[in-house]
Amino acid sequence: SFIRNATNKSGWQIFPEFVITQGVKSLPALEVFQTYFGCGKIFINKRYDNHHEHLYRFCVRSIDDLSKKIIPFFKRYRLRTAKQKDFLVFAKIVRLMERKQHYTPRGMRRIANLVGTMNRKKRSRFLESPETIRRSPAKRDKI
């Protein structure tokens, strides 16, 4: 995720987020994930629309936990859904962040472009930001 952060030099903060969302009936499954991996938190997403149950999210944001626990697990036990492609992109983003690429303008653009290839409903605000457009790489720079 990209969020505005005035305290960062770039004005943006990037944080990877692995999320599994389930209804209340599957909350015990999320608790099993949390116990098995020994990391992450479970949050409630209260819904006030026409759905009758709230959703729960198992969320892991620590780069260390992602790179040492979550990614190795899902590389060994591959997803058998369309999410596998997104997972591979996510793993690449985490690797870039481990190498501190997200601290450079070029690295941030590269990560933003990778995020744009994932199953998303809308374009990243980072890519639409006037600051990002002004700092776009020259044609010779490849992202």
Regions found by a protein language model. Name each.
Residues 1-143:
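Internal intein/HINT superfamily modules and their associated LAGLIDADG
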